[in-house]
Swiss-Prot record:
The name this protein goes by in its record: NAD kinase
E.C. no: 2.7.1.23
Any one Gene Ontology cellular component term annotated for this protein: cytoplasm
Cofactor(s) of this protein: a divalent metal cation
Pfam families: NAD_kinase, NAD_kinase_C
Keywords assigned: ATP-binding, Cytoplasm, Kinase, NAD, NADP, Nucleotide-binding, Transferase
Length: 278
């Protein structure tokens, strides 16, 4: 846990909500609480704290809205549905959130994010960041690509595609593919195959691989064509991808640390296991 530098100026707060009725109600209550408080200034421009109201998808959108300001921004999530992995507060805990923010001392919890670098055949380079995951697929035909880990050719992959996830993203698409669940404070990436071909002719490892912070992953397609690349909830299509590189970004996402911070394992239990039967 680290602490962000604080000054005597008012804390700038951005409130981002989805269009659901309950989310709008929460947003209105937060606006009313901070609007006339001299210690806070409501603004979506250059905020110190971003309050995301909705679900994990809303927080993903908020992350990408402010991904160029990660050094200066801390996030906090309010869930208006079932408990999310990025949310510490439910919609009925708004008063607790308001009180915690009024007593905030700048403490934060940081999680690693994914750096994505796409190189095209024409020399163009596209750079992006992902909070959860990125995939590369070739929809119309089997994807054939070399998987290179830390400059070592690990395997030649044949199948539908490849997913690379962050620890926080390990509970999303990665888990549905049989990948491991990683605690978000672990600085590592996870590479997971999507429907790989495994028979007497073609072989892949067939299981997820955990990649440490110091190593990088390269996916090098071996066939020309159109590739579909997802970066969190955004999907793009590129023709003739030379390679796509994945590594842990120099930046991280910072969350407001409060007494109400829900432990990661509580979130996993709530999402996938629930209360045990007696």
């Amino acid at each position: 846990m680290t602490q962000m530098n604080f000054t005597d100026r008012a804390t700038r707060v951005a409130i981002i909500a989805n269009g659901k009725y309950q989310s709008k109600r929460v947003a209105s209550k937060l606006f009313a609480a901070f609007k006339h408080d001299p210690d806070f200034y409501l603004s979506k421009k250059d905020p110190d704290i971003v309050i995301s109201i909705g679900g994990d998808g809303m927080l993903l959108s908020a992350f990408h809205m402010y991904e160029k300001q990660l050094d200066k921004v801390r996030f906090v999530g309010v869930h208006t549905g079932h408990l999310g992995f990025y949310t510490d507060y439910r919609d009925f805990e708004v008063d607790t959130l308001i009180n915690n923010l009024k007593n905030d001392e700048g403490e934060q919890i940081s999680y690693p994010i994914l750096k994505v670098t796409i190189t095209l055949e024409d020399g163009r380079v596209i750079r992006a960041r992902a909070l959860n995951e990125s995939t590369i697929k070739r929809i119309e035909k089997t994807m054939v690509a070399d998987v290179v880990i830390n400059q070592v050719v690990f395997e030649r992959f044949r199948g539908d595609g490849i997913l690379v996830s962050t620890p926080t993203g390990s509970t999303a698409y990665n888990k549905s593919l049989g990948g491991a669940v990683l605690h978000p404070t672990i600085e590592a990436l996870q590479l997971t195959e999507i429907s790989s071909l495994n028979n007497r002719v073609y072989r892949t490892l067939g299981s997820s691989v955990i990649i440490p912070k110091k190593d990088a992953i390269e996916i090098v397609p071996k066939r020309v064509g159109v590739y579909t690349i997802s970066i969190d909830n955004k999907t793009v299509h590129y023709k003739n991808v030379t390679k796509i590189e994945y590594s842990i970004d120099e930046k991280s996402i910072n969350f407001v640390s409060t007494p109400s911070h829900t432990s990661f394992w509580e979130r996993v239990n709530d999402a996938f296991i629930g209360e045990p039967e007696h």
